[in-house]
From Swiss-Prot:
One GO process term, biological-process aspect: DNA repair
Signal sequence, start to end: none
Predominant subcellular localization, coarse grouping: nucleus
Pfam families xref list: Swi3
Annotated segments matching region Disordered: 1-47, 172-229
InterPro entries cross-referenced by the UniProt entry: Csm3 (IPR012923), TIPIN/Csm3/Swi3 (IPR040038)
Quaternary structure, from the entry: Component of the fork protection complex (FPC) consisting of TOF1 and CSM3.
Entry GO MF terms: DNA binding
Family: Belongs to the CSM3 family.
Transmembrane segments: none
One Gene Ontology CC term in the entry: replication fork protection complex
Protein name: Chromosome segregation in meiosis protein 3
Organism: Phaeosphaeria nodorum (strain SN15 / ATCC MYA-4574 / FGSC 10173)
Location(s), subcellular: Nucleus
Length: 244
């Protein structure tokens, strides 16, 4: 019985064991570490990465591309095409005596257009950039096309003039043909309106009968010497004819 009593712990030892104290040392921490699962110790290094608590967050800003005043922007709809539209609709020059006002309105229109197209640059700087871009091959080709569009079309003008001449000449030819037809119709009408051959023969016969029935009268010289003044000349001409 004695050995069993010696192995049995006392009440104080039981209290120490329950409180995690063995032989004056705290064993609660060592037991907790020994009982901790192995996977917890292995994944302790990546736990902060998954939760994002202990690791520093690095924020990277995305760079917004800066718009450039290049040929693509100038040839887009807000570019030179819009400038051409507003210049036709809004810009009106007053002419002689108003040169200063006309230039001021034109510069104001250019300034407003460039401010909408490329607000990052000042007016003078934007003009310098546009001048450099204008030397590119693409801009030179487009400028040539715009100049050709503004020129009057000579071929169309000549075609219109030719059409007018044809229209003017057409009535004259028609009138000439109508006049010729009228002359021919008039001649035909005159021929138709003329007397027939039988009627002409009858008229000629009547005139011949009248001539035969009429008495022949010869010119009689008056005794008073009233001769024809041309009688002597006529006789001389007759004598000359006989000589030949």
């Amino acid at each position: 019985m004695a050995p069993s009593r010696a192995n049995t712990p006392s009440d104080d030892e039981l209290d120490n064991i329950l409180n995690g104290i063995t032989e004056g040392r705290d064993i609660s921490g060592t037991q907790a570490e020994s009982t901790r699962p192995a996977y917890a110790s292995k994944g302790s290094g990546n736990a902060g990465d998954g939760l994002g608590i202990d690791e520093e967050i690095i924020i990277t800003k995305k760079r917004i591309p800066i718009p450039k005043l290049d040929d693509n922007r100038l040839l887009s709809d807000p570019g030179i095409p819009r400038l051409r539209r507003i210049s036709k609709d809004r810009l009106r020059f007053k002419g002689k005596g108003h040169e200063y006002g006309d230039i001021a309105r034109m510069l104001n229109m250019y300034q407003l257009w460039l401010d909408d197209l490329y607000p990052r640059a000042k007016f003078a700087d934007a003009l310098t950039i546009i001048e450099k871009v204008g030397h590119t091959k693409r801009m030179q080709m487009m400028r040539k096309e715009w100049i050709d569009e503004g020129k009057p079309r000579r071929t169309s003008a000549y075609e219109e003039e030719d059409a007018d001449e044809v229209v003017v000449q057409a009535p004259t030819t028609e009138q000439a043909t109508e006049s010729m037809e009228g002359v021919e119709q008039g001649e035909e009408g005159a021929e138709r309106a003329g007397p027939d051959e039988d009627e002409l023969d009858a008229l000629l016969a009547e005139s011949a009968q009248q001539n035969t029935s009429a008495p022949k009268t010869l010119p009689v010289r008056t005794a008073g010497g009233e001769d024809d003044p041309f009688a002597d000349e006529m006789e001389a001409m007759v004598d000359m004819e006989d000589m030949w």
